Amino acid sequence: LHLSLRRQRQMCIRDSDEDYHREISLEIARHLQNVINLEREQSILVVGLGNSAITADSLGPHVVENLHITRHMIREYGLQSLGKEKMHRISGIIPGVMAQTGMETSEIIQGIVAETKPDIVIAIDALAARSTRRLNRTIQITDTGINPGSGVGNHRVGLTEENLQVKVIGIGVPTVVDAATIVHDSMAHLLEALEEAEQKEFLEEMISPHLHTMFVTPKDVDETVKYLSFTISEGLNMAFEEIGG
């Protein structure tokens, strides 16, 4: 298990062992407890970004489907019905994509935030990898929000604290990589003898522009997304389970 701190305070978790589910879920819970105050009761909205009809883009929706949603139970029946004295109020939404709704995701979430007034928004999305080594092997947690679609050049309005007026945590996993990155990584060892500027010039000449719009995903993406989404949802459930005294 490898942990590293990346720019914008993004925490990455990489693992090469297939039997990592429980360990990674615990790490996700620990990191979430570090970036948000879960010592007191919070109202938390979890947003599953992406298109559930496209496997590589369905990470967010699958995470929300596996969450322990509690807000409605607490509102209707009170904490006693759940046998708890304290509990976070968890709600979830799968907003779909603009082609399905005709609305920006940010518009939908802004409306929900204005109506339900959560303390924190957690947004989960599939990402585009900048390296083939990170594909399906890195979980990024950031406290600076998330920009839906930006990894594949489909720039939408970001889900950030500035836009929503509440703290936004972003969680992402790179599930696709563009063809140009595959070519770049494949040729990297061959070009080690060249200076960095020469490498860049050579690759720009070699890589056709259309390769930057062609995205590739592993053949086992169905099973991988199912596994990753369950691992993340269990991490969230663990993080939300206990509240300090």
Pin down the residues of each PLM region:
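Proline-aspartate-enriched helix->loop->beta-strand connector
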Residues: 113, 118-119
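Single conserved hydrophobic/aromatic residue that forms the stacking wall/gate
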Residues: 2-13
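A structural-propensity feature for long, helix-poor, extended segments
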Residues: 81-112
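A glycine- and small-aliphatic-rich helix-loop capping segment at beta-alpha/alpha-beta transitions
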Residues: 31, 55-73, 138-147
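A structural signal for small-residue-enriched, beta-sheet-centric alpha/beta enzyme cores
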Residues: 93-94, 123-245
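Gly/Ser/Thr-rich loops at beta-strand to alpha-helix junctions
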Residues: 49-59, 99, 126-130
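Short glycine-rich or small-residue beta-strand-to-loop segments that form or flank ligand, phosphate
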Residues: 43-54, 92-96
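Active-site cofactor/substrate anionic-group-binding motifs, chiefly glycine-
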Residues: 1, 17, 21-40, 67-70
